[in-house]
């Protein structure tokens, strides 16, 4: 039974500890929009998105006012565009026109991002997939709200090294195409292994083909709440620490579950999942890094960091699963450098390197996220980092991703401003030894032996 103390506790989480619903994401299937005419395809895409999403933003605001729960973003994800545009698109420029249609639909609906300018190439690339991938630099430079993702591997299929090599080049080209904005286009481009179909978070959201025609997903966020809870158990043993994280994650997820159910009912769209991810922001007191330091680390990156993150990730899942009927997406702890003030501080003081971040991705929710690297970094080195991260995901049967930003004209130690939720980041050192001969072999890395479950 709910008592007044729990009500007050939730109010305090929202007012003082930065608890919010990070996103309500409306997933929309565009499979029924396929057409051999590019103009007709664009018209169908725009018409379907605007028909289904016309009340998304207003409904989100109503829920905010009625329940007092901040909902930071209202977003849209769509079917991976490479799957629906094969008949209509004969060149990268044709795909760019679809990106511009998505951008216009997002702007007209009042959402800040639309995801799904994507290709799924974990085993091989069709001609259409390759056209879309090659269009990404132009598409992201010509739009404001479009987010792109490419899935280059999975535990079941292995890693498509041809796609890995190509994505290193595409990230470099995207950085160059948006260099006037500190290579911001790369912040809207994610390379995945084991990408989920129901991720509500950008920039990696797309509406998977296993999903219904339309569905509501919700992503919660409460790093500040978890940190505040841990302040009351300083010096206690690990059992108490784990119990505290688990109970707090339960309460945070319950808020997301409530918002998801209400939004689903009012929009007349099925409820999909709640994503349990602890998503930080650049605001002070809204940091995953500060949670790890509250556990007893002098600075994130110190010995013990990976163990602390593993503990946090696991307890968040255990608490969250009890709080929602349907849990999905990425669900864990995000460690984006530019979006987390604690991570930024750790990089500046020298305790946190890319290599340590890679180790942390073995046990956390996603991967190497929002990391600024020198603009002179070769495409082959970026591909090598993608391959390393994909291997972690493939072998460990988990989602991993890379969102690197080679900032043109910047070098190690320079500070780069991205703005808003994307924050700012110091440019980090990348290992300069060459891996091009390895990357240029081409072909596929086979799936691991434990992927054979039949």
Curated annotation (Swiss-Prot):
Protein family membership: Belongs to the UPF0210 family.
Pfam families: DUF711
Gene3D superfamilies: 3.20.70.20
CDD domains named among the record's database cross-references: RNR_PFL_like_DUF711
Full protein name: UPF0210 protein Mhun_2657
Domain of life: Archaea
InterPro entries (UniProt xref): UPF0210 (IPR007841)
